[in-house]
Every structure is written in structure tokens, then in C-alpha cells.
Amino acid sequence: MTPAPEPGPRWLTESEQDAWYAWRRMFPLVNAEIARDLTQDSGLSEADYDVLSVLGSTDGHRMRVSALAELMRWSRSRLSHQLTRMEQRGAVRREGVATDGRGAEVVLTDAGVAVITEAAPLHVESVRRHLIDALTPEQLRTLAEVGEVLRERLGARRKV
């Protein structure tokens, strides 16, 4: 009788290792370039832009704080600090929920709408320059498919 193979790590094949290293090298480089452009062009951080763009895409430009934290996969503490900074700049405000004394909503202000409206075209151009225009349509489809598979596997509910 042949003994069962010893349990151990499932080492990466050469092609798997190539894919892993490509991801590890590519993502931070592309992200850093886009984040740098965002800050230079609009004065926004990635976190600012993420909050503004999510709120800007909701009905009434508002969302429960707890739902926003869950959607963004941030701790409530991290979101609270981010919202405090954004409130100080007048981009958002927090309001109590009339039907729930414990709940709070974050609301995009008119100033916040103006900021995201001005920043979005510049941000899209940066995304195009550093990612979209570098890839063929087929590569973009593959990237989108890979992203969706990983998001589903990790339980993500919405694009942020």
C-alpha cells in the first residue's frame, strides 16, 4: 500500500507565481499614480473620493452610516474619522434618522456635489491614462471578469 502524500503547502506553479507577482507589482503602482493625480488635480484623497462618489450615486445623496461602512468594508471608527474630516470641509453632514433614534445618515452637501462634479472628469482621465488606455479591449474584459470572480468569492456586494 502506498502511503498518502504528506500534507503541506500547495506551492505556486511558475505561471501562478508570475500572475501573483504581476498583481503585487501592478496594483500598487497603478493605484499610486491614480491617487497622486487625484490629490494633485482636486485636493481629494482616495478615501474622500470614494465616499463622495458612493453618496453621489445614491438616491437623495444620503446613506445610513452603518450601510456606508459595510459597503466600503471600513470599520465604523475609520468611517467616523473620515466623515469628521469631510464635515469640517463642508462636503458632507451627518443627520439623525427620524425613525431610529440610534441611527445616523451621512448626506452629501451641495458643496460635496460640487467637489465630486469637478473631480470626476479629472479622475476618469487619470484612470484612462494609467489603466484603461494601456490595455486592449480583450484585456479589459479579462480584468473585469477576474475582478468580478474575486469580488464574488470575497463576498463584496457593490462596486465602490
Per-region residue spans from a language model:
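Charged, amphipathic alpha-helical coiled-coil/dimerization segments
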Residues: 2-8, 84-142
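N-terminal leader segment of winged-helix/HTH proteins
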Residues: 1-42, 89, 137
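A cross-family signal for key residues in well-ordered alpha-helices
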Residues: 21, 53, 117, 144
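Exposed, interaction-prone assembly regions rather than primary DNA-binding/catalytic cores
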Residues: 139-160
